C-alpha cells in the first residue's frame, strides 16, 4: 500500500513538473533574452528525472523485478530515458534551445503513460516465465534507450526539415516579389528602395536568419550524434535479444512482427548513417531518412502491443476509457 501510494505521488509530481517545464521552454523560445525561466525549466527537468528514477525504483522494489514487463512500465522507462537525454546537453551547453524539442516528447510520453487509457496495467504483475531472465534488463533496457535516442534525434531532424523548407518557401516568395516589381517597370528609385527593403528582411546574413542558420547547424549536429548513440543501443539490443531468444526458444531469429520491425528500424538508420558519410547528402537529405525512421520506430514500438500477436506480445494492451 505504501509503495503504491508513493508510486502514485511520484507519477503525478513528475507529470506536473514536466508540464510546467514545457511551458517555461515555450516562453524561453519565444523570448530569447529570458534567462531565468530557462534555468528554472532545466532544474525542473532534473527534478522530473529524479522523480521518474524514484518511480522506477519504487516499482522495482514493489514488484520484485526490473520494471520493463509491460507497456506502462516501458513508457515510464522511455520517459526516464527522454529526460536523461534532455538533461545531458544542459551540463555541456547551459543555454540550448534544442531541449524544447526533447521536453515536448517527454511530456507526450509521460502524459500517455499516466492517462486513463492504461489503467488496467498500472498495477505491477507477476513476471511471466518467458521474461524471468537476466537478459530482461540487458535486452529491453537497450531497446528502450535506443528508441529514446533515435526518437529524439529523428525529432531534431524533423525540426530541421520544417525550418529548412520554411526558409525555402519565404525565399522563393521574396524572389517572386522582386520579379513582379521588375515586370511592372516601377521607377528606378522606387524599385531600388523596394529591393533594398526585401534584402534587408530576407538576407541570409541578417540577425534573424543568422540565428536560424546557427540553429539548423545545432539541429544537424545533435541529431547525428544522438541517432548514432541510439543506433549503437539498438544494435546491442537486437544482438542481446537474439542470444536471449536462442536460450528461451531455441532460435536466434524467428521473424515475428517485433523482430521484423526492429530489423527494418536498424536498416533505416543504417542508411541514415551512411548518408552522413557523403557531404552532398548531409543536412536536409539525411534528415528525410531520419524523419522516415521516426515513423518506423513508433510502428515498431506500438505495433505489436496494439496487435497482441507474436513472441513479443507480453506487453500488449487494450485501450480502456474510464
From Swiss-Prot:
Any GO CC annotation of this UniProt entry: chloroplast thylakoid membrane
User: How is it placed in the membrane, per its record?
Assistant: Multi-pass membrane protein
Q: Subunit comment for this entry?
A: May interact with Ccs1.
User: Superkingdom of this entry's organism?
Assistant: Eukaryota
Specify whether Chloroplast is a keyword of the entry. yes
Q: Which GO terms describe its biological process?
A: cytochrome complex assembly
Q: Which UniProt keywords apply?
A: Chloroplast, Cytochrome c-type biogenesis, Membrane, Plastid, Thylakoid, Transmembrane, Transmembrane helix
- Its recorded name reads Cytochrome c biogenesis protein CcsA
> What's the family?
Belongs to the CcmF/CycK/Ccl1/NrfE/CcsA family.
Q: Which function does this protein serve?
A: Required during biogenesis of c-type cytochromes (cytochrome c6 and cytochrome f) at the step of heme attachment.
Subcellular location, principal: plastid
Task: Tell me one Pfam family matched here.
Answer: Cytochrom_C_asm
Query: Which parts pass through the membrane?
Result: 9-29, 44-64, 71-91, 98-118, 143-163, 226-246, 253-273, 287-307
Where is the protein localized? Plastid, Chloroplast thylakoid membrane
Q: Which organism is it from?
A: Helianthus annuus
Q: Which GO terms describe its molecular function?
A: heme binding
Amino acid at each position: 500500500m505504501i509503495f503504491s501510494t508513493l508510486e502514485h505521488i511520484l507519477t503525478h509530481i513528475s507529470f506536473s513538473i514536466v508540464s510546467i517545464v514545457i511551458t517555461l521552454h515555450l516562453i524561453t523560445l519565444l523570448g530569447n533574452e529570458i534567462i531565468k525561466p530557462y534555468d528554472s525549466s532545466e532544474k525542473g527537468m532534473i527534478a522530473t528525472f529524479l522523480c521518474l528514477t524514484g518511480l522506477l525504483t519504487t516499482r522495482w522494489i514493489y514488484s520484485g523485478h526490473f520494471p520493463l514487463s509491460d507497456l506502462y512500465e516501458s513508457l515510464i522507462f522511455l520517459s526516464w530515458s527522454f529526460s536523461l537525454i534532455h538533461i545531458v546537453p544542459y551540463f555541456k551547453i547551459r543555454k540550448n534551445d534544442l531541449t524544447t524539442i526533447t521536453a515536448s516528447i517527454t511530456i507526450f510520453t509521460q502524459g500517455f503513460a499516466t492517462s486513463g487509457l492504461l489503467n488496467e496495467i498500472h498495477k505491477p504483475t507477476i513476471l511471466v516465465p518467458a521474461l524471468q531472465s537476466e537478459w530482461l534488463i540487458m535486452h529491453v533496457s537497450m531497446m528502450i534507450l535506443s528508441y529514446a535516442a533515435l526518437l529524439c534525434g529523428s525529432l531534431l531532424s524533423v525540426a530541421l526539415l520544417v525550418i529548412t523548407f520554411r526558409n525555402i518557401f519565404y525565399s522563393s516568395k521574396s524572389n517572386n516579389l522582386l520579379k513582379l516589381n521588375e515586370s511592372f517597370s516601377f521607377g528606378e528609385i522606387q524599385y531600388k528602395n523596394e529591393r533594398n527593403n526585401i534584402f534587408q528582411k530576407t538576407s541570409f546574413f541578417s540577425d534573424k536568419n543568422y540565428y536560424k542558420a546557427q540553429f539548423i547547424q545545432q539541429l544537424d549536429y545533435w541529431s547525428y550524434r544522438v541517432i548514432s548513440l541510439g543506433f549503437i543501443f539498438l544494435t546491442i539490443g537486437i544482438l542481446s535479444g537474439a542470444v536471449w531468444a536462442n536460450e528461451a526458444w531455441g532460435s536466434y531469429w524467428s521473424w515475428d512482427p517485433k523482430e521484423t520491425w526492429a530489423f527494418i528500424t536498424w536498416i533505416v538508420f543504417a542508411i541514415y548513417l551512411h548518408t552522413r558519410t557523403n557531404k552532398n547528402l548531409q543536412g536536409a537529405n539525411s534528415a528525410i531518412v531520419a524523419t522516415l525512421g521516426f515513423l518506423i520506430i513508433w510502428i515498431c514500438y506500438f505495433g505489436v502491443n496494439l496487435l497482441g500477436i507474436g513472441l513479443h506480445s507480453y506487453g500488449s494492451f487494450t485501450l480502456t476509457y474510464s
